[in-house]
């Protein structure tokens, strides 16, 4: 059950939080961080990790629809590879890479929930993570050769990107940011790294949303969760489409600079007192 002091946003607050979730989930800037900082700026309570995880199901729905064709090819191609016992086929390698790449975040998420209940959401943690990942993304942007596409990916690539995805349990890191960074380090093209990040995120988003919805179920939360999820779906779809097109023609430096500025803004807010830890 939810804690007695859990805050439930009203209908328009839920729509706004869903919009924030949708816009920021797939951009490498951390949706969790923005869902923590935005309410603090406008004077709302923190909706909590459970609300954040549940409305991510809207982002999941957007991925499933946007990449429906890719997913259909992966499923049918993997089934064909299984029947033919040809495990070098591309759909099989991609599918297995996604599955094994999900293991690290599942294990880490279970451990965090068992030990601490939820990840830390203090603003100083978010600021540190935002700047730290920006440095890594900048390094990857500079050193990555960007020669590989999705056709070259194998199971080991899924493992490495999956390990990076587990770091996103730290608020401020960003799941898309950590996986995009890992993809660039593996010399993927920017748009290919983003597409793989989206596909890899499907199991993680599903498991996080369903687990939190079931374990923290409260009838009073259904309306805000539903509205937030719907809003997140719409804005996630638009965000995915924009990012794929953006990375086909531009670098990630826009997000690197934004992350550093975002982290410094939080630090300034904490120092001046207009943000509470």
From Swiss-Prot:
InterPro entries per the UniProt record, alphabetical: UppP (IPR003824)
Keyword annotations of the record: Antibiotic resistance, Cell inner membrane, Cell membrane, Cell shape, Cell wall biogenesis/degradation, Hydrolase, Membrane, Peptidoglycan synthesis, Transmembrane, Transmembrane helix
Disulfide bridge positions per record: none
Note: Bacitracin is thought to be involved in the inhibition of peptidoglycan synthesis by sequestering undecaprenyl diphosphate, thereby reducing the pool of lipid carrier available.
Job description of the protein: Catalyzes the dephosphorylation of undecaprenyl diphosphate (UPP). Confers resistance to bacitracin.
Catalytic reactions of this protein: di-trans,octa-cis-undecaprenyl diphosphate + H2O = di-trans,octa-cis-undecaprenyl phosphate + phosphate + H(+)
Location within or outside the cell: Cell inner membrane
Chain segments annotated as transmembrane: 11-31, 47-67, 96-116, 123-143, 153-173, 197-217, 227-247, 254-274
Family: Belongs to the UppP family.
One term of GO molecular function: undecaprenyl-diphosphatase activity
Full protein name: Undecaprenyl-diphosphatase
Principal location: membrane
PANTHER family linked to this entry: UNDECAPRENYL-DIPHOSPHATASE
Any one GO BP annotation for this protein: response to antibiotic
Originating species: Synechococcus sp. (strain JA-2-3B'a(2-13))
One annotated Gene Ontology cellular component of this protein: plasma membrane
Entry annotated with the keyword Zinc: no
Mode of membrane association: Multi-pass membrane protein
Family annotation (Pfam families): BacA (PF02673)
Record EC number: 3.6.1.27
């Amino acid at each position: 059950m939810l804690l007695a002091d859990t805050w439930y946003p009203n209908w328009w607050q839920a729509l706004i939080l869903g919009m924030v979730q949708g816009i920021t989930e797939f951009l490498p800037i951390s949706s969790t961080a923005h869902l923590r900082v935005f309410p603090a700026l406008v004077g709302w309570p923190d909706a909590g990790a459970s609300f954040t995880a549940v409305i991510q199901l809207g982002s999941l729905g957007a991925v499933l629809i946007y990449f429906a064709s890719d997913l259909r090819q992966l499923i049918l191609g993997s089934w064909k590879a299984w029947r033919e016992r040809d495990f070098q086929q591309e759909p099989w390698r991609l599918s297995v890479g996604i599955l094994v790449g999900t293991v690290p975040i599942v294990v880490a998420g279970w451990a965090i929930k068992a030990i601490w209940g939820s990840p830390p959401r203090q603003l100083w943690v978010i600021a540190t993570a935002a700047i730290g990942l920006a440095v890594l993304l900048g390094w990857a942007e500079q050193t990555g050769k960007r020669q590989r596409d999705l056709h070259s990916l194998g199971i080991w690539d899924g493992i490495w990107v999956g390990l990076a995805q587990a770091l996103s349990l730290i608020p401020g890191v960003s799941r898309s940011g950590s996986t995009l960074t890992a993809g660039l380090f593996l010399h993927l093209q920017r748009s290919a790294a983003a597409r793989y990040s989206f596909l890899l995120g499907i199991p993680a988003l599903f498991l996080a949303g369903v687990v939190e919805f079931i374990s923290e179920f409260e009838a009073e939360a259904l309306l805000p969760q539903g509205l937030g999820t719907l809003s997140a779906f719409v804005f996630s779809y638009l965000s995915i489409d924009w990012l794929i097109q953006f990375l086909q023609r531009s670098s990630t430096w826009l997000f690197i600079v934004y992350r550093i500025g975002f982290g410094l803004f939080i630090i300034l807010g904490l120092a001046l007192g207009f943000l509470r830890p």
